[in-house]
Every structure is written in C-alpha cells, then in structure tokens.
Amino acid sequence: MASRTKTGLMETPRSKPSPPTPRVSKPTVTKSDGNSPSPVQSTRLSIDRSPQTVNSKPVSDRRTARVPTPPEANYFLIIICMAFQKSQSRLGKGTGLLVQQTQEDLRKANEQIERLKKDKAKALDDLKESEKLTKEANEKLREALAAQHHAEKSSEIEKFRAVELEQAGIEAVHKKEVSWKKEVESIRSQHALDISALLSTTEELHRIKQELAMTADAKNKALSHAEEATKIAENQAEKAEILSSELSRLKALVGSDEQKKSNEDDEVVSKLKSEIEMLRGKLEKVSILENTLKDQEESIELLHVDLQAAKMVESYANNLAAEWKNEVDKQVEESKELKTSASESLDLAMKQLEENNHALHEAELGNATLKEKVESLVTTIGRQENDLEESQHQVCISKEETSKLEKLVESIKSDLETTQGEKVRALLNEKTATSQIQNLLSEKTELATELENCKKEEEKIKKAMESLTLDLQEVSVEAKEAKEKLLTCQAELELCGVQIESLKLAEKDTNEKHGKMLEDARNEIDGLKSSLENTENEFFNSKTEWEQRELHLMLCVKKLEDGNFSVQEELSKVKNLLHLKEVEACAAKEEDAKMQTNRKELEEEIKDLQEIVEVAKADSMKLKESLVEKEDELKNTAAENRKLREMEVSSIDKIDQLSKVKESLVDKETKLQNIIQEAEELRVKEIDYLKKIEELSAAKESLVEKETKLLSTVQEAEELRRRELACLKKIEELSAVNERLVDKETKLQSSIQEVEVLKEREAENIKQIEELSLSNERLVEKEAKLQTVVQENEELREKESAYQKKIEELSKVDEIFADREAKLQSSTQENEELREREVAYLKKIEELAKLQENLLDKENELHDMVLEIEDLKAKDSLAEKKIEELSNLNKSLLVKESELQDVVFENEKLKSKEALSLKTTEELSDVKQTLADKEKELKTAVVENEKLKAQAASSFQKIEELKNLKQSLLDKENELEGVFQANEELKAKEASSLKKIDELLHLEQSWIDKGNENQELKVREASAAKRIEELSKMKESLLDKELQTVIHDNYELKAREASALKKIEELSKLLEEASSTHEKGEEITNTNPFDNSTGEQKVQESPLEAIDRHLKDDTTIHWSAHNVQVIGKGEKGKDKDTVESEVYHLEKREASSERDTEHDFAEEEVDSKAEGSENFDQLSNGLSLAEQTEDVVSKDQQQKKKKPLLRKFGNLLKKKSSSQK
C-alpha cells in the first residue's frame, strides 16, 4: 500500500502547469512606459515567480520538493502589507499608479486562476481516466473469477480423468482375474486327469486280477500236467530199465537194435528237454505278468500320493480364496472410506480457495493508508487557513501601520539582502543536492534492480519473514513515537518538511520506476537550472523594479484602498470555506481513529495469517513426505507383484512339466494296455496249449511256485526301490511347492501389513486435510474482509473526489490554493497508481500461479539467496545511511517512510501467504489426484474381488464335485483293499523297505547323481520290453514245435512198448534157463529199494533243494552215466562184488554231492538275500540284474529237467550191466 502512495505522490508534479508562468513575465522587464507599468508588474511577477521557483525545485528533485507551502503565501502577504505601508507613507506621490498596478496584479491573478481551473479540468479528466482504470480493474477481477470457474471446470475434467484411470485399473484387475481363472481351470483339469488316471488304473487292476486268476488256474493245470508227465516218464523209465536188461541179454544178438534204441532214447531226452524249455518260457510269461501287476500297484500308490498332493493343493487354494475374500472386503471398505475422505478433501480445497480470495480482499485493506494521507492533506489545508487568518490580521495591522512603511521598507531591503544571501546558499545547496540526487539515483537504480530480484525471491525467503515481522512491530512502535514527535516539530519545520517530503518521495519513486526516473530527473534538473538562471535574472530585475515601485507606492495606496473592499469580501468567503473545512477536518480525524483501530486489527490478522501459513507449511511438508513414502511403497508393491508374477510363471512352467510327465505316464499306460491285450491273446493260446500239457505239469507245481516266489521277491524288491525313488522325487517336488507357497503366504502377509500402514497414513493425511480446511475457512473469512476493505476504498475515492471539488473552490483564493490543488492532483494520481497497482496485483497473482510450479525447484536455492539477501541488507544499510544524511532535517518523516515500508512488507507478506495458499491448493490437488488414483485402484480391487468371489463360487462347486469323485475313489480304494489283502507279504516287505527309506533320506544327494543312471535304466527298460516281445514270439513258435514233438514222441513210445512186449514174450521163454541171472535180479531188487528210498527222499525234499542239486550235480550225473556205459561195454568180465562196490560208491558220491549242493544252495539263498539288501541302493541296475537272474533261472530249469532223466538213464544202464553180469 505504501508503494502505491509513493508512486502517486511522485507522479503528481508532472501534471503541474506552474513552471511556464515565469517565462511569460520576461517581456515585462523591458517595458517601462506609463501605459504598461512594468516595474510594478515585474515586482509582482517576481514575487509570483519566487514561490514558483521554489515549486520548480522540488520538481527538479523529483518528488523531493512539493508545491509551494503556506509560508510562501505569508511571505507574499507580507510584501503586500509592506507595499500598503509604503503607499500610506507616500499617499501624495502616486496613489493612482498603485491602483493601476494592483488592478493589473488582480488581472494576472485572475489569469492564473483560470489556468488553475484548466488544471482542475485536467485533473478531473485524470479522475475520469482513473475511473476507467477502476472499471478495467473490475473487468480483470471478473476475468479472474472466470479463471476460477475455468479452474473448477478443469478440476471436474481431472475428476473425469481420474474416473477413466479407475476404469483402466478395473480392466487390469479383470485381466488378472481371468489369469487366475485360467490357473484354477488348469488345476481343475489336472485334477480331472488324475482322477481319470486313477479310474483307468482301477480298471486295469480289475483286469489284472482276472488275468492272475486265469494264470493261477493255468499254473495249476500246468503243474498237474507236469506231474502226470513225470509219472509217465517214471513208468517209461521202468519199462526202459526192463527193456535195457532184456537188451543187454540180447546184446550180442541184437547189437544194431541197441544202437537204434540208444538213438531213440537220445531223441526222447531231447524232446523232454524241449518240453521243459517250453514250460520255462510259460513260467517266464507268468513272471512278466506278475511284474506288470507290481508296476501297476506302484502306479496306483503314486496316484494315491498325487491325490493327497491334489487334496493339499485344493485346501491351500480354498484358504487362499478365503484370504482373498477377506482382503477384498477390507479393500472395499477402504475404498468407501477413501471416497468419503476425497469428497471431504475437495470441499476443504474449495473452502481454501474461498479463504484465499478473502485474504486478497483483506490485503486491499491496506488502502486505508489513503485515508490517513487525505487527513494529512486536510490538516495542511487547515494550517493554510490559519495562515490566511494571520494574513487577514496582518492586513488590518498594515492599515494601522502605514506610517511605519518607510521603516519596514528599510528592513525589507535588509531582508532582501539576507534573502539574496539565502538564495545563493539555497542555490549552492540545490547544486549539492542535485549532485547527491544523481549519486542516489545511480545507487537507487542498482538498488531497484536488486529489489526487483528480492521481490521475485521474497517468496523463497519465508524464514526471514518471521524476523521481519518482529522488526515491523518495533518499527510500528517507533512510528507511534515519531508521530508524537511530528506534532511538536511540524510547526517549526513546515518549510523544511516540504523539501524533505519531496526528497523522500523522489527516493521512493526511484525504487519503483528505476531507470525511467533517472531520465525524468535529469530533464527536471535541466529545467531547474534554467529556472534558477531565470530567477537570478528576475532577481536583478526585481531590484530595479523595487526602486521604481517606491516611486509609485503612493499611487498604489489609493488603489489598494479600493481593492481592500473587494479583498475583504473575498476573505469573508474564505472564512466560510474555512469553517466548512474545519468541520471536515474533525470528521477526518474521527476517520483516522477508525483507520488506526482497523490497522491494529489488520496487524493482528496478519500475525494470525503468518501462524496459519507456518502451520500450512509444516502440513505441506508432511504431505510431501507422506506422498514420497507412498510412492516408495507403491514401487515396493509393484516389485513384489512382479516377483509374484514371476513365481506364477515358474509355477505354470512346472505345472506344464508335470503335465508332460503325466502324458508320458499315460503313454506308458497305453503301452501297458497293449501289452496286456497281447498277453490276453497269448493266454487264449496258452489255454489251448495247457490242455495238452496238463498231464506233464503236475509234478513241477511246487518248483514253479517257489521259483515264481523268488522271482516275485526280486521283482518286488526292485519295484519297491522304484517306488521309493518316485516317492522321494514327489516328496522333493512337494517340499519345493510347499516352500513356494510359504513364501507366497509371507509375501501376502507383508503386503497386508503394508496396506494397513497405508491406511494409517491416509488417516493422518485426512486429519491434516481437515486442519488445512479450517485454515482455508479462515482465509475465506479474511477474503470477505478484504472485499469490505475494497468497498471502503471505493467510498474513500468518492470522498476524495468530493474533497477535490472543494479544493477547486478554494483554489480561487490564490497560488496557495493552486498548490493545494496540485497536492490533490497528486492524490488522484496516487489513486490512479493504486488502480494500476491493482491491475499489476492481478497480473502478479497470475504470475504467482505460474511461479508456484517453480517453487519446489527454487527451494534448493534458498541458502544462496540468504547470502544475497545479506549483501542486499548491507547495501540497504549503506543506502539508509545516505538517506539519513539527506534526511537529517527531519527524522520523523523517516518514521513515516518506515510505516509505509511496513505496509509494503505487510502487502508482500500477504502475497507470500497467498502464494503459500496457492501452493497448499496445488498440493491438495496433487493429493486429490493421488486419492483419485487410489479410488481407481480400489474400484479395480472391488471388481477383482467380485470376480474372485465368482471364481470362488465356481471353485466351491468344483470342489464339491471333486469331493464326490473322492468318495467314489474311496469306494474303489475299499475294493482295492481286498486286492491288497492278498499281498500281505509284500506289505511286510514294504514295512522293512520304509525303514530303509528313513535311512535313505540321508542319501538324497546320491540319488541326484543317479538321476542320469535312471534315464539309462529307462532306455534299458525300453530295450527289455522289446526283448520281451521278441521272446513272446519265440515262445509261441517253440510251444508249437514242442507240442508236435511231444505228440510224435508219444506215438513212437507206444510203438516201442508194443515191440517191447513182443520181445518180452519171446524172452520169457528164456527165463527158465537163466536162473543165475534171476538171483542177480534179486540183488538188484535189494538195491532198488535203496534207490526207491532215495527217490522218495528226493520227492520229499523241497523243490528248491532239488533245483540246487540238479544245478550242482549235473557233472556227476554225466560222469556216473559215462562210467555205467563203460562198465556195460568194457568190463563185462568183472566180478559182481567189484561192480556192486563201484555202484555203491557212486551212489554215495551222488548223495554227498546232492547234500553239498543243497547246502550250497541254502547259502546262495542267504547270500542272495543279503545281496538284495545291499543292492537295494543300486536300483538303477535293477533291470540288468533281473535279466541276469532270468537267464540263470532258465539255465537252472533246463539243468533240472535234464538231471532226473539222466539219473534214470544211469539206473537203467546199471540194471542192464548187472543183468548182463
């Protein structure tokens, strides 16, 4: 506000038309005729010019000297009084001339009054222009209101954008839900596949059960056939022995027949061997079927494990769904709360805007200083009225003291000389002042540039403003003291006060107008120099004119007497006007008191605003920190979401891998089904073949059963090892899955905690927003007050226009009134400047709105600016020192400057507060945007939750379906339990294997290394499957051949029996002759019971011992047979005792060898079991061992089948040799 008054006071002298008057009076100096009383005119004009020159000085000093003051008017009146006295003393000399001169002076005064009227008209035009400016300012205010409406519309647009962003977030949530649905569907599909696999396995188990039953029946039939075959073979062996005895007798006669028979026997042996190999092939097929059964049981167990894992996954999915539901409900509630808080924050922001507008209006209350200035003008007018009263008294005294004019003239001459000296001094002072002013202007330009920078940076110096407020309070106290001093010093320092006011106003004006003012000041200084030269010339002319006036004073006295009457009439009018002005002065004083009270209230409000601004700053800093923290949290949540997505991708990949594994298992199952179908076809064929072999398979049932048991134990061990490997792998996979799930749970818990923290922070932010809303309401109230102040300013302007009209009426008195009118014009210019400043303020408000965006960047530069401010303060201190040197004439006026500066600082503080309020509004707008974003996120979360609910409902339905399937599976499992009861021995072995599994858990690392070996085993399995298929084909071909050979052998045996019977009949006739041979036959019968007993023992022996005995004694049998043949052929002449001893030793050797083989076989069984436990860790080589064992078993079976035939053949040879002997 002070700056407005400064510019107004400084710009008033430009409109003043006073300087041209002295130039008009120059030609009057040359005229000295009687028609044109030049001396009187020159004296009058010189007297008139003297105050004008004084007025021109202030113009040159540029607001340092104001318009002529009342003391100059007094001086003019004194000169008039002296003229009256001289005229009274010289009444006889020239009263007529004086009357003419006074008339001419009156004419000139009238001309000056007309000029003043013209100036008044110009001032009125200026007032009209100022009114136009006010209208423009009002239009700009309207534009500002329109801008506010535009801002509101833009805020609505931002709301719509926020809604669009929310919709985009909702779409993203939809996408996520779709992805979750796909995952759930994939899991369900996997469950369905598992269930289908279980069903297929159960069906296969039923089929396998049926096949086992069929194979068991076939085995029984085959064993019965084998027993029948063994019986037939024994009968045939007995017959062969009889025949061999008979053939030995008839050997000499029928040597060729014996050779044929031996060849036939060999053929029989070969046929029997082929039959035994066929039986072994069938046994191998049965063992293969048992292996397939075991594999399928293992697959069933694996499927059970998978079911359990699926159950775990389902339970975990249900838990996750429940947790997601809870989180969704919480997020919905939070979204509702955030919506309410956002609406409240918007309302609060609108309130803050209204409060800022009120603050702007309150800032305009600073215009109250205009009232004080008007009152100061009224006081000056009152003083001038007092001076007029004194002049009237002096006129009365002049009538009484006409006799004393001569003395006064002499005193006037002395005064003139003193005034000349004073004028010379004043000229010197003016020169020094001009030089100082130039220096000050140069300094002030620098200060002005620095002040502009300071003004731009005042918003950055918020901390320094607090210290300035304290200084302002001190300055206000000093201003009050200075006002008290002013009242005492104004009477004494009226003349000096005008000059000092003009200087200070010029200084203030220079601070605002910078370089332009320098040029104006230089031009004015040039004008002042010319005016000083003119005044010097006029002074010399005035001396001559005074001498001439002394001659014409007598003439002027008469004219003055006539003019006194008119002057008295004018004085009466002036008195009336003075009374009116006194009444107005009283009213102005009352208004001053009101303004002071209003000013105090404004200072208190400013303090409150400062506190509010500080609180708003702290709140804004907190909001910024909270926003930064929220941004960091959003980044962390985004990173966690990315990690979760990566984990999901990895889990999906693993699921794909598991699906591939399942597909491979399905392929294997299809292969197994194909194999089973082929086995069924083979079974059909075997049934046909078994019907033919039932007679031969009875004797070998026990051996086959034990062999199958051994093979089953080996295969079970291998299967158990495989199951253990599969279980361990699945356990590892499940453990990894569980760890991932645990990690996800921890991450979800951390995210939930972060959401709770965000909620707490949002609550804090809402509280801060409520506090800001209260401060905004206060600002709105202050803006209302500012509007009232604006209205009061408008009323003051109207009053000022009324005062100007009154001043125009007073201007008729003389140049004094003209000077007063110039002051009024300066006030009008101040009003114009105020209007211009209002426009500038509006522009600045717009600029401040733009600067708000740059405030954050400029806060970092505050420290540098503080140093610059200190430099500026140093420069200001230097400038203040210079100003104090110039203003030593009156310190009280400096106090007024400080008051004006206080007002300026207050205005600047208000601006800074407005800027802070705008910042807070921007921050609130940012907070609104963040809240809008959060609302969008919450909406998306709500949509996702709804989708999740739908998915959860569908998942619950599917879970119910799965439960039903589980029940069906449980029923099937109950059915399978019946199957598992038959495998109690396997369960016992599984218990032992489980114990070993606990030990093998420590060897998990070794299993990882053996993964490659498992792959090789898979390759071997494939090759083994191919071999099995080839062997099955070979077996079918061999079975066909063997059956044909067996049938052919049976026919041959029957033919031989017939031929043998015939020969027996022929030989029976020869028995009577061979009595000695009969006795030997009895001895042979004695040995035969021994052999029979040994045979019975052999039958009583276990089939496993017989197998071992045949395996170990093959060589001994061949050796004994060879010896028997040698005995039969080469040693016919030995004694009976030697033959019997040899046979006895051979039988002992056979028995001992059989016992040794039994012992060795038992030891081999123990060793095989130990090796089975030791080789349990080497599951990768199980298939190769199985193949080796199968080869060994096949060889053993072949040897076993050969051994009894060889023994029987040896016995026959013995009998033949004995019979021959």
Swiss-Prot record:
UniProt keyword Ligase, yes or no: no
Primary localization class, coarse: plastid
Region Disordered, annotated ranges: 1-68, 1073-1221
GO cellular component terms attached to this protein's record: chloroplast; microtubule associated complex
Keywords carried by this UniProt record: Chloroplast, Coiled coil, Plastid, Transit peptide
Coiled coil regions, renumbered to chain: 95-149, 202-543, 587-1084
Location in the cell: Plastid, Chloroplast
Residue spans of biased composition, Basic and acidic residues class: 1073-1083, 1106-1116, 1129-1160
Transit peptide: 1-82
GO biological process: reciprocal meiotic recombination
Biased composition (Polar residues): 32-58, 1084-1097, 1175-1187
Family matches, as PANTHER family: SYNAPTONEMAL COMPLEX PROTEIN-RELATED, WEB FAMILY PROTEIN
Similarity comment: family membership: Belongs to the WEB family.
Identification of the protein by name: WEB family protein At4g27595, chloroplastic
